[in-house]
Amino acid sequence: MAMDFIRIRGARTHNLKNIDLDLPRDKLIVITGLSGSGKSSLAFDTIYAEGQRRYVESLSAYARQFLSVMEKPDLDHIEGLSPAISIEQKSTSHNPRSTVGTITEIYDYLRLLYARVGQPRCPDHGFPLEAQTVSQMVDHMLTLDPEQRYMLLAPVIRDRKGEHAQVFEQLRAQGFVRVRVDGELYEIDAVPPLALRQKHTIEAVIDRFRPREDIKQRLAESFETALKLGEGMVAVQSLDDATAAPHLFSSKYSCPVCDYSLPELEPRLFSFNAPVGACPSCDGLGVAEFFDPDRVVVHPELSLSAGAVRGWDRRNAYYFQLIASLAKHYKFDVDAVWNTLPAKVRQAVLFGSGDEVISFTYFTDAGGRTTRKHRFEGILPNLERRYRETESPAVREELTKYVSQQPCPACNGTRLNRAARNVFVADRPLPELVVLPVNEALNFFRGLSLPGWRGEIASKIVKEIGERLGFLVDVGLDYLTLERKADTLSGGEAQRIRLASQIGAGLVGVMYVLDEPSIGLHQRDNERLLGTLTRLRDLGNTVIVVEHDEDAIRLADHVLDIGPGAGVHGGEICAQGTLQDILESPRSLTGQYLSGKRRIEIPKQRHKPNPKMMLHLRGATGNNLKNVDLEIPAGLLTCITGVSGSGKSTLINDTLFTLAANEINGASHTVAPHREVENLDLFDKVVDIDQSPIGRTPRSNPATYTGMFTPLRELFAQVPESRARGYSPGRFSFNVRGGRCEACQGDGMIKVEMHFLPDVYVPCDVCHGKRYNRETLEIRYKGFNISDVLQMTVEDALRLFEPVPSIARKLETLVDVGLSYIKLGQSATTLSGGEAQRVKLSKELSRRDTGRTLYILDEPTTGLHFHDIEALLGVLHKLRDEGNTVVVIEHNLDVIKTADWIVDLGPEGGHRGGTILVSGTPEDVAAHKASYTGQFLAKMLPSVKARETRPAAMANKPDARPPRKVKPEKVAKATKTATKKTAKKKAS
């Protein structure tokens, strides 16, 4: 009998509290609850892990050793599982060769299509490389004007130097009467002597004729003779019209003009990962690295002597003496601002003097001077040479700061070699197709109709390509291009690509486990995504989704609410069943938010911007941005909204953040193209909080990441017993020798490799999982040793360390961002995406604040429940109220409706986006008819506009200054002033 339920008994993975539940099979199940309540522990670490483990164990022991087998979950019993496929938020491959096309396998089908029905052309002359039969050649000639006279030519010599007397002898011996030499017709006995050192082309005249039906046989014989003599190449030239282009024929797969040929087309010719297809200059990467003048001249507003080019100023005697000699030769002042120097001088300094010899004065070790004349190498060639010749990783890393990337000049960034770039299907080469947005590519293939045998072969391949492109459109990724690099995709995009690939596989009877597929998706596209999930279910699969999105919860066949709290306070089932069951459950927080008993309130009054304190970014043109001018009010909470692919990340992460980090923090990021920026001096610090993991090793934990572990170790080193023994703070680190347990090297666990079974981690039998040796554990603070402290939750630790300000401040900020339940020593690899981002946020909050920080957050609501979002908004509003500027890229309407200012990009994704539709308050955006964000926002805002009374907190600060163009010296001065003022306040 077929099982109708997945039965789980006694699940205790991570924080799950011995739960029993029955989940219906072949249904869409949504698991929801607070961040850290145990959703992923149930969905991924229990259900998926056991489903995958059982399937893998059905394979042979030999096969199992090549597969990663997940750890066996801690539970009593589970039944009714199917083979499991997980689609997680993890970003895709960081391999620069991985693209949207290769991940979805669409590119593999495109390679097959071009190899089987592609028509190669000569890269130089554009002629199709087609092998024609004699019959086809004759038939073509018979279509020409029968009144015109033509001659049939066989090319014997092509562009070769020499007198070629022996060639004429051979032709005469074979009975040929006329030849054409370099375009001139001669009797064979009257050919003038040819110049020895010039290139010549010699063609034998095989026949002269008028194309009529009655000479068909003669023409065929003439063509056969010509092909034999011309090694498969024939030309037919009009005798009556010398200016007419010749008709060229080839019996082999080659260009009739230059004899360029290709071997038989194979799919690997179109692979940029195979040597036969990759561009030889960039090895198929599509980019070339070069030393960028804009990165080398760090401060163009300074002079060469003051440090316009780092390392070539007065502080470096050797390089500066070269500059001084150059200045003498070209008659320029080393103290003149770089931007004011003549173009010729700047060219010579950066790229060298070319053939011009310059007299250089060098200081000798003895203190004397010596003069030598030679060419000047140039700063950029100097860097290139040092980069090429050095064997020191440190030097190479230092020089990498000056390197930028540009599209490979040989292949124009297409990654393929000449041959592959010149194969056409319906007059389009492969590189032209992969740069099309997915929806345009889909339209192309839907309209593709090839004649004859090509059409028959192409139909099956095109069907597969069309289906896969259609699935990408269904999950809201119609704006992506197939050549987009995988490492530039957001977590949500990467997950939806994998989802599209799974639908393309069309499996039945499988259990899919998904982690928040709605991340990064605008409300407009949500419906299509949910349709995709229901289609997966309707195929006959069980779809388990960890999700916070209201629409997804309402659509589910079965909802599971885990809680009531997070961490140690969660791990229980608060409610399960249909949507109605959840709404009626008094224990379900989710139900209370869905029913409207609880909700995130709209602020009663919005902060209004101060027109004198606006950050201006003008002329942004990165990726799909269309000369965008961005205004962000300082001291407010600004939301950047827009459909997926509209240009939000390019504008904020790639342009604004990189620019601000370079100017204010002294970073060296590559900035997306823009024209100018004004008023960056309103800020003294810029902080970017993204969703990347806080650590990729089990040794990284919240205590080490937030910097709390250092004062903790210092505190333990100050305990009287510790001082008596002479212990330093390093004694309490599990990363270095001294205080850690050397049997497990401070891991607390020992890994036992089991080959074809999952690796087993057992507690170290020396320290019993405590990570430290016995002597270190004897040191106690208020009865707790360092291992006990690492096992504490944040809230317990706060009670213990309240009297220690340096530790308490960091613990308080972890509580503020809703992470009171995590353990101080919890491995960073076990934190969810939302938790990792909030640990980062707490780290920034715990730093001393000047009230002039620019915070940039990319979808901070990822992995957060309605209740968590309310707490997060409290933190963001607190930052704003202290005068800081908070810029958030967000799709969540609860965050958007509480913002002071919104910048909405659109109208669509990809090349149909990239413009700012509307900027203003949420009410302004809701009133804008063209804005998709506005349409959804209007449903959440009351009809009466919120009163705009309170000015921005930052506007009243004494630091406020009128707008002006940013200069690095002024940024430094502003920072210094702010620091002094803060110090004065503290003193008073």
UniProtKB/Swiss-Prot annotation:
Coiled coil: none
Main location: cytoplasm
Signal sequence bounds: none
Stretches annotated zinc finger (C4-type): 255-282, 741-767
UniProt GO molecular function: ATP binding; ATP hydrolysis activity; DNA binding; excinuclease ABC activity; zinc ion binding
Biased composition (Basic residues): 978-988
Binding site for ATP: 33-40, 642-649
Keywords associated with the record: ATP-binding, Cytoplasm, DNA damage, DNA excision, DNA repair, DNA-binding, Excision nuclease, Metal-binding, Nucleotide-binding, Repeat, SOS response, Zinc, Zinc-finger
Subcellular location: Cytoplasm
Ranges of Basic and acidic residues composition bias in the record: 958-972
GO cellular component: cytoplasm; excinuclease repair complex
Region annotation (Disordered) ranges: 948-988
CDD domains from the UniProt entry: ABC_UvrA_I, ABC_UvrA_II
Record family assignment: Belongs to the ABC transporter superfamily. UvrA family.
Xref: NCBIfam families: PRK00349.1 (NF001503), uvra (TIGR00630)
PANTHER family with a match to the protein in the record: UVRABC SYSTEM PROTEIN A
Subunit structure: Forms a heterotetramer with UvrB during the search for lesions.
Cited function: The UvrABC repair system catalyzes the recognition and processing of DNA lesions. UvrA is an ATPase and a DNA-binding protein. A damage recognition complex composed of 2 UvrA and 2 UvrB subunits scans DNA for abnormalities. When the presence of a lesion has been verified by UvrB, the UvrA molecules dissociate.
Protein name per UniProt: UvrABC system protein A
Native source species: Xanthomonas campestris pv. campestris (strain ATCC 33913 / DSM 3586 / NCPPB 528 / LMG 568 / P 25)
Gene name in the database record: uvrA
